[in-house]
């Protein structure tokens, strides 16, 4: 399941619901990654734009990989502004045992960092400045010559 949430994530609420689901399904593995906006240089926070249709397609591929491994994959990401100390990204992989859940967890997070259609901006003096040096070009993107 993919959730796009305006502003910072309420990780307590999300994790509570996901953990209850894991318990109801009698899963023994519950792997969590939470991205927290950290203080860096003179930023107030980060801001995110999302190409929703592409993100849904990208996530669906991972959802099917997870299902093939007997793992349930959950992801939530912020849209818009997220201040220092708040969470912008949460993913959970859960399954019967740790092996498949952990394997998927690492690969998913790395692929997310490089291929998810989410654009990051620094918030500096209440202005959004594209974080080009911390961004990765999407495969197949760019201008046609």
Curated annotation (Swiss-Prot):
One of the protein's GO biological processes: Mo-molybdopterin cofactor biosynthetic process
EC number: 2.8.1.12
Catalytic activity from the UniProt record: 2 [molybdopterin-synthase sulfur-carrier protein]-C-terminal-Gly-aminoethanethioate + cyclic pyranopterin phosphate + H2O = molybdopterin + 2 [molybdopterin-synthase sulfur-carrier protein]-C-terminal Gly-Gly + 2 H(+)
Sequence positions that bind substrate: 36-38, 97-98, 113, 120-122
UniProt keyword Transferase present: yes
InterPro entries with a match to the protein in the record: MoaE_sf, Mopterin_biosynth_MoaE
Entries under SUPFAM superfamilies matching the protein: Molybdopterin synthase subunit MoaE (SSF54690)
Protein name: Molybdopterin synthase catalytic subunit
Organism: Helicobacter pylori (strain ATCC 700392 / 26695) (Campylobacter pylori)
